[in-house]
């Protein structure tokens, strides 16, 4: 798209000077490359000595220009009198930007587009439609073919083009090219008849600081079918009052329809009628709204759809299952969840296990995403084993399944703290630094807890403690006066209910995801004094699964009777758990398949008969 021409005279030196001394490449540059494109009307009229500014439609039709001069009025520079930097809006249309900056550019429109522009101008200037466009919901037939398929949102035009808000969006580009900024009233009345919109919102015509220049403010909130007719009436009244009036000072930057594209907002257009749907859709209907992350984004054109898709892809490579779950299912704080539905979860877990056992290895060991869970990765031993290895995404599938079945299919609303971003990694601290950080945090924690307890006691709360040792002392003191099942278990639960409550509260406020679960806190806690250490040791002895019972959480969370019931439903035999040396969190599972087969649940038996038959192997005695 570039034509070659002879180099301009300024570049070639006269023969008298020796060319080699001046420029060794003179002969190389025999042809000079110039970008094609017409001279703009702005430049042409400037060179003729006229005052450059958009012409009326009649003048533009009568104007004779030499070849190579385009007739687009969009290239005219906006006069300084009307420019208002503070309230002005930044256009996007390259020609408008160039004109606004006062830099003339070449016009690179195709010939065909120019011809169509001219036909449009002819049509609008010479005749009137049978029924005006602002009465019916779309431009009348003769103009319809001249409306581009490309929607011009108002964000693309800057100051001087506010009159476009009452014009059908598919005709805006053509109108802007044939009319330029600040349309004359007479021309505007014709434009409204040919390509005016029927409903665009309530409007207001204001005088600007420059005389004979008016500004249209449109409020898109309340749209009605009569907007177009009322507006036409108002403009014709204005024409009668002030025949020299021109409309189009600036777009109001606060108007709902205008927002620079960087803000990724979309103009709420009332859609035009298409052939498919015979009549205009409801006037108040908003555009399609698509969710991008947790933000809804309005979509009115293909361009917006592309933008939305791009934004989606930035946020999540794949469609984000967790976002779906967040929308569809109730979600519980994890510990509570397991405490409530342990038996059912484990049954489902076993069912999953048996399904997986029948699948080939490649399916059984799926490659996983970053493993960050609601229960910290470090605390995964608190989850049932099957779930301990799953990613949060896969786990949420299992949870959501039970959230529905257990709550009579009603998913209630609940708050979700989004998880830490798995893609962000930081350098691990050195051991010394880590220890230092931990001790520092612990010191702060203890001060915090003590302060909390102190405040609470001052308020008159009785069951608040500042440390484990104090918790155990108060518990033992209380148990002296009333029946207690087992002092230390109760002590542990006191620790849970009091100390942890404040911490969890803090973590929730800080927007963190993990709550400290009971037992993990007991195991991780570093004693602050000898007495504390002794107390802590005895608590740990009671809780140690190797010595006492199979399921730790149940023991701490409920009384012993509940625990026995839980133990029976889980059918975990009270033997010490054998730890696997390689992975400290992987417990060898006791009586894995026998567990469900011999349970007292009849329905279970019915379900399992086939599976049992499949797994029984009889010894063949030779």
From Swiss-Prot:
PROSITE patterns linked: HAV_P29_PRO
Enzyme Commission number(s): 3.4.22.-
GO biological process: proteolysis; symbiont-mediated suppression of host innate immune response
InterPro entries: Peptidase_C7_dom (IPR002704)
Coiled-coil residue spans: none
GO MF annotation: an example: cysteine-type endopeptidase activity
Record keyword Protease present: yes
Residues marked Cleavage (site): 248-249
Note: Hypoviruses induce hypovirulence in their fungal host Cryphonectria parasitica. The consequence is attenuation of the related fungal disease, chestnut blight, that causes cankers that enlarge and kill branches and trunks. The virus-like genetic elements consist of cytoplasmically replicating double-stranded RNA.
Protein name, entry field: Polyprotein p69
Native organism: Cryphonectria hypovirus 1 (strain Euro7)
